[in-house]
Amino acid sequence: LLERAKFKEITMYDHIGLKVKSLDASVRFYTAALAPLGYVLSSRDDSGAGFGPKGEPALWLYAHKGPAAEGAHIAFRAPDHAAIRKFHSEGVKAGGRDNGGAGPRADYSPTYFAAFLIDPDGNNVEAVCT
């Protein structure tokens, strides 16, 4: 079992970068899905875009002409269950595919609540609160 404490203590990452096939489609998806979690588009040009809390990018999307690297799993912290539900609904409206609706995941931990989406490039994107 994954213990709740493990999720609160992870601070080893400064940022994550993903190659994307369509920057416009990815920006549309991440703008909609991450807004309920408090993450905003903070940087954008023809080569990429950055998202993060308070305008400090922690997720970078890089426009890439070749195949994107699909299959990554990224989990974003959410403030509450309502934000996770909105992450899922807004993400689906913006082109994401359902990969697990908002709800408890008791097999992860007794307090784990999450939703999962597949982004336009095939990555598994999660919103979670514990």
Regions from the PLM with identified roles:
Residues 12, 67-70, 109:
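Short glycine-enriched loop/turn motifs at secondary-structure junctions
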Residues 52-93:
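Long, continuous compositionally biased terminal/linker segments
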Residues 1-2:
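Leucine-biased recognition of intrinsically disordered, low-complexity hydrophobic segments
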Residues 40-44, 72, 82, 94, ...:
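Long, contiguous binding/interaction regions
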Residues 22-24, 76-121:
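Vicinal oxygen chelate
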Residues 58-62, 116, 125-129:
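Conserved beta-strand in the GNAT
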Residues 18-58:
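Core segments of cupin and vicinal oxygen chelate
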Residues 6-27, 74:
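N-terminal beta-strand motif that seeds the catalytic metal site of vicinal oxygen chelate
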